[in-house]
Design a protein with these regions (language model features):
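Catalytic-core regions of core metabolic enzymes
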Residues: 1-479
Length: 479
């Protein structure tokens, strides 16, 4: 595939939205609005046969009426009209068409499948590449192109190709709450022309993309895709969520994007052999993306854990070991430094994970948590350091705020000088209606925001942190 075709899609000098409506509830209206809201710098041409203006922009009855060339078309017209549109696209020199248009093969109707075949033949005849049909298209913060409301306007390192528009929107919204930012996102639907392999190959060579994530319901050419995936994982991490794993899921896939799901066990084995990371939920994918985007390579299993309280320390030991890490004993030099700060009666309790909550108040207020974290981060005995932020200590509001503020400032300082991977576990709660104004959850959310702004990976639970970071370990051991 000529790479410049997708370069045109992601860096178009002009975009036409065909079927642009004045109905504010329509997707076609939103596509035009997003180009304006997100600051697209190229020319925007709404195509509407009955209106002269849309959102302050001059409209045109057809592509043929546009005086200049058009690079990229977003098609929002009924499927039977698409072949004629492609003829107009050819005349205007359009290189890529995003078919938001649906109701094709995914309907299961014979006539819809025949129309889809005609559309593909027409596109190939004219040398036009298609994204879709039945998809949301492209989100490119660098260019100011978006298919969703309230997506981040600033770019980042994560590139995505998702077969589902709904899943891609959900992922962008929730991952952005964790601080993730995006290079390019493609919702590609039925993959009539450009498919998962094309998008993977493009993102693998894209300098703006450092990590790749994909949600797929089926693959058009398994051998070709796996070959491209193996080549890509040699240079960039790829995280894959395969939907349609069971009987009901397979049925849903067929009606959603007209994909053949295939055997998940075969999928799983093949994907893992390429060096890609296979996840099972969007939440696990977000955790993995946070880890790959912000952690340096994790090259060993020796983990040091500080803080969290007694029960959390015990759970930490279990859950890190169950995930495949080794909660190694504290080295003598760190134990010796801690014994200088606490009375002898506490010496027998100084172990990894280090639970400062059982130590005297003087250890808390002196910042011993941060000092231990710093020593672990500098020690050759650990490959990875985890800060469990204590959210339920035996103290009141003012004391808790002061203590956690101190912890977070210590973490920020250590991160600035870090010599090994550092991550944080901070539970900001699952909020009910009455909790949003509670000082505790508001304060913890502020601390999480501070940490993510510094590109420190933050996880809501120990188990999520351990599983996600183990994905990083697995990837770098293979590559």
């Amino acid at each position: 595939m000529p790479m410049h075709k997708l370069e045109t899609a992601f860096h178009p000098r002009s975009i036409a939205v065909v079927g642009a409506s004045t109905n504010t509830m329509s997707a076609s209206y939103s596509f035009v609005q997003h180009l304006l809201t997100y600051g697209y710098r190229g020319k925007i041409y709404p195509i509407n046969i009955s209106k002269s203006k849309l959102l302050g922009l001059k409209t045109y009855p057809s592509l043929k009426d546009i005086p200049d060339s058009v690079d990229y078309v977003i098609c929002c017209i009924p499927a039977p009209k698409v072949p004629d549109l492609l003829q107009e696209c050819h005349q205007k020199g359009v290189k890529v068409v995003h078919l938001f248009t649906g109701r094709l093969t995914e309907t299961g109707l014979v006539e819809a499948a025949e129309l889809e075949k005609e559309i593909l033949e027409q596109a190939r005849k004219f040398g036009i590449r298609l994204i879709g049909p039945n998809c949301m298209g492209i989100y490119s913060p660098f260019e100011g192109i978006s298919f969703g409301y309230d997506f981040p306007t600033e770019p980042g390192p994560l590139g995505m190709f998702f077969q589902s528009g709904g899943a891609s929107t959900e992922f962008v919204h929730y991952a952005s709450l964790r601080g993730i930012r995006f290079s390019k996102v493609i919702s590609y639907g039925n993959a009539l022309d450009l498919d998962e392999t094309d998008f993977l190959q493009y993102l693998s060579q894209d300098a703006e993309t450092k990590v790749i994530a994909s949600y797929m319901e089926g693959i058009k050419d398994g051998r070709k895709f796996l070959c491209a995936l193996r080549q890509t994982t040699a240079v960039k991490p790829v995280i894959i969520l395969k939907a349609g794993r069971g009987v009901a899921g397979t049925r849903a896939v067929a009606s959603h994007t007209a994909s053949l799901a295939g055997s998940f066990r075969i999928w799983e084995t093949a994907i893992r052999q390429t060096g890609a990371i296979l996840v099972h939920t969007l939440e696990e994918m977000i955790d993995a993306a946070v880890s790959f985007c912000w952690l340096p390579p994790v090259l060993g299993t020796r983990v040091g854990v500080v803080g969290g309280g007694g029960g959390k320390s015990v759970r930490s030991a279990d859950e890190w070991e169950e995930a495949g890490f080794h909660v190694v004993p504290l080295p003598p030099e760190i134990r010796q430094e801690i014994t200088k700060k606490v009375p002898q009666m506490w010496w027998d309790w100084i172990e990894n994970p280090v639970d400062v909550s059982i130590m005297p108040e003087s250890a808390w207020v002196s910042g011993l948590n941060g000092e231990i974290l710093r020593m672990m981060s500098e020690s050759p005995s650990f490959d990875l350091v985890i800060a469990n932020i204590t959210v339920d200590g035996p103290f009141g509001k003012n004391e808790m705020i002061a203590f956690i503020n101190g912890e977070v400032q210590d973490i920020l300082e250590i991160n600035r000088r870090r010599t090994k991977p550092l991550a944080v576990v901070l539970d900001t709660g699952t909020l009910g209606i009455g909790d949003f104004d509670h000082w505790r959850w508001r304060f913890l959310a502020e601390q999480k925001t501070t940490l993510t702004a510094a590109k420190i990976p933050v996880y809501p639970t120990i188990a999520q942190a351990a599983k996600a970071i183990h994905h990083v370990l697995t990837y770098y051991r293979k590559n």
